[in-house]
């Protein structure tokens, strides 16, 4: 990057499962850099590990301010709803506390056999298929949608419809404002209807717990609860699909790493940490706005400036990780921030780790000879946007 050029986001990503080379370039030469958004606005991007952690824990970088109409319209969803992506302070604390009541250790323990059954069913479908097959279509997508369905206590077809609307509401540049508004209206109507049903007929699921707890405590409005639950859907459908698919692609590309897990299932938990470090779900995080003048890594950001962090880039920082571009399922230590950092860190990290460990343990034991059916170099990126790290398909094969 020259001293006068400003890179445009979304960045080119020649290898779909690898971060854009632009992130490495910025991290090494301009760790706090201006970037151009699809809207034409300019924002700051922070790319080094320590700086990213600093921003994520700094109250002067506000998610709430990013939801103001004067902020760049990066992701329409953020400005449409008071979600976990667009609130700070006591309001955010109340929302997290309510969500934590649903994602408590007891609930996660009760979900473990449910998750195992979902994984087993998906792998049964894989075993019944004639290779080569698209692993994403047969395994990753059904698992992602069924996990969310069980978590929320709804049917998989409902999750599929919710996810379709969320994709539009989270669009960076693919659709127009009118379509975003239409999808958003449908999305809110669906979630409010589900919440009312859960209040009338509660079950042992996240939605029921949240709906009942909020009725008793009255800490949030219906609109705020809807926003919080939509945040869960955003992170709970596309993210596991991308992490499972891209994680497997990395394992099969580095076949010796896959074989280590086949040989010793006890290595899977540590491997999951490397998979999420190496294969993050997003290239940059949601927008924040600086509320007062601040200096990051020698660069002055004035109050009102829009700013992003890149956990993807931070997790490849050579000042934090030895050989950060090497995929090593036994990496230790591995103090990544794949699940975020600070007040807005992922509230479902323990649940996500359990799901991923269950999945990769079962997969490597049932399909020890799984292989890529197409060269790794031929993988294609699914599309551009904030959630742009997915691949179109992952063809796999195995001896029959």
From Swiss-Prot:
The keyword Transmembrane applies. Gene3D superfamilies: Cytochrome P450. SUPFAM superfamilies: Cytochrome P450. Pfam families: p450 (PF00067). Its main location: membrane. The keyword Heme applies. It comes from the Bacteria. GO terms for molecular function: heme binding; iron ion binding; monooxygenase activity; oxidoreductase activity, acting on paired donors, with incorporation or reduction of molecular oxygen. Its cofactor is heme. It is a multi-pass membrane protein. Its EC number is 1.14.-.-. It is found in: Cell membrane. One of its GO terms (cellular component) is plasma membrane. The chain crosses the membrane at residues 225-245, 294-314. Keywords: Cell membrane, Heme, Iron, Membrane, Metal-binding, Monooxygenase, Oxidoreductase, Transmembrane, Transmembrane helix. Heme binds at residue 346. Belongs to the cytochrome P450 family. This is Putative cytochrome P450 141. The lineage of its organism: Bacteria, Bacillati, Actinomycetota, Actinomycetes, Mycobacteriales. The gene is cyp141.
